[in-house]
Curated annotation (Swiss-Prot):
Residues 1-20 form the signal peptide. The gene is Cel. One of its GO terms (molecular function) is acetylesterase activity. It is found in: Secreted. Glycans are attached at residue 207. This is Bile salt-activated lipase. It comes from Rattus norvegicus.
Amino acid sequence: MGRLEVLFLGLTCCLAAACAAKLGAVYTEGGFVEGVNKKLSLLGGDSVDIFKGIPFATAKTLENPQRHPGWQGTLKATDFKKRCLQATITQDDTYGQEDCLYLNIWVPQGRKQVSHDLPVMVWIYGGAFLMGSGQGANFLKNYLYDGEEIATRGNVIVVTFNYRVGPLGFLSTGDANLPGNFGLRDQHMAIAWVKRNIAAFGGDPDNITIFGESAGAASVSLQTLSPYNKGLIRRAISQSGVALSPWAIQENPLFWAKTIAKKVGCPTEDTAKMAGCLKITDPRALTLAYRLPLKSQEYPIVHYLAFIPVVDGDFIPDDPINLYDNAADIDYLAGINDMDGHLFATVDVPAIDKAKQDVTEEDFYRLVSGHTVAKGLKGTQATFDIYTESWAQDPSQENMKKTVVAFETDILFLIPTEMALAQHRAHAKSAKTYSYLFSHPSRMPIYPKWMGADHADDLQYVFGKPFATPLGYRAQDRTVSKAMIAYWTNFAKSGDPNMGNSPVPTHWYPYTTENGNYLDINKKITSTSMKEHLREKFLKFWAVTFEMLPTVVGDHTPPEDDSEAAPVPPTDDSQGGPVPPTDDSQTTPVPPTDNSQAGDSVEAQMPGPIGF
């Protein structure tokens, strides 16, 4: 065999990620780990070291995670581990396993020497706190959260990891017997492991950025607010979710704990006995006890997201809005997709994506009432009025459907994100604040032509999929991906998305409450992409007009009489506009909040995984 043939075979070996990592065997607190090195071209040069499946913690069912005890010999870190136990998409079975707390690392390497002191980006996945994994969705071994493109294009270390989800990650009795937040504590353990060990991989332990999307973005926000992470995190990026999101904190965990306990045959009157029983129940039974009907639900879908973080007096010691002093020195970048609410609107108002089915005023009014229960009839009416102002001039179905999506986007994503940005800015000491809107239209061919960027549409661009799978994307998609990776990794390096090794298409100015600066990210990013005060009219409505209305329902409990109830919409033209209900049968119900309201009908409506 000739020398050229030998060389070719050797290069092919490395391109298949079968060569030993350039770092060699790396010593961690648990023992030695050895990954693989993947060459980025046949001619050699740059490469990436990849370590998959490194254990960072262990955990028993419904208990806090503990440090992993370590291993003997050298761990071959070459394959992703199974995700944490969760329901399948059909919710009639489970997959994954309880032994799931593993992380993955991508380290870019140059031609001559191994990397050192690189910024570190730690990814937290979304999935409604119900599903997901550190590697993400898989299509022909092409994993969504493969960190290679970010690492090599941005010259940063990328870390992803698993954390517990669903009842196993967030079931809580609301007291010390079962405090919950196990999934958040898993995340913290991964961040702390990175802090202690990443220097051995060439990373800078004093320059860690956590970033995430949806439930992962809310997790990022909550991690910056938790006193447990003091000194661990330098910067944070929240994509479509914050700690102040209406779906990020469960205010009534005991109700849902009792509901699950009843389903699996555990006592419910005493939380200590209930917790003890739940901890020894088959984890698969606990997981499958939570189920969601994805149609014909009585309330907006977010009301059914039961197993999510709680204020436990410890890891999350207070209402998140009171914890922003803890993030005063953490640079923060946050934003939303311009039609983030579309995914949820398709569940709440199924006609949204159906060309031959109309959205009616009644549909929208009922949706609004479900989201404005706390302010009763006046809140529902005021909200309905401001969002439907354009309908008189443009009663087209396109305009009406876009209004529904805009409303869900505002209340679930934009308003809480703007609140979080303002809180961060108000409490920041040395930290900087940046805001964005992602508006590159969805590539889903089944969506209406008016569709913008749906929930999670940004993920493929942040993780460089237009480069990893070029045949599936257009040149404009690669332009968007290149810009997002550049801004994100520059921010991780310096706290400024403009400053770093990667050139950017235009200068991104910091956010303040006075200027309302945000960068509009799409295929054409120019100086005109820097804009101010996103949807200012609606922000003012929610912050001023809506907030000034008297609260008639506290803590999501039902109204006591019809005068306070959220109304149902008109049913014919003679009514002219939405009117309040005239009897109990017309009142829009609110989700149950305590055991007195529990029953078979409630359990039949109980949700499972969707969206966030």
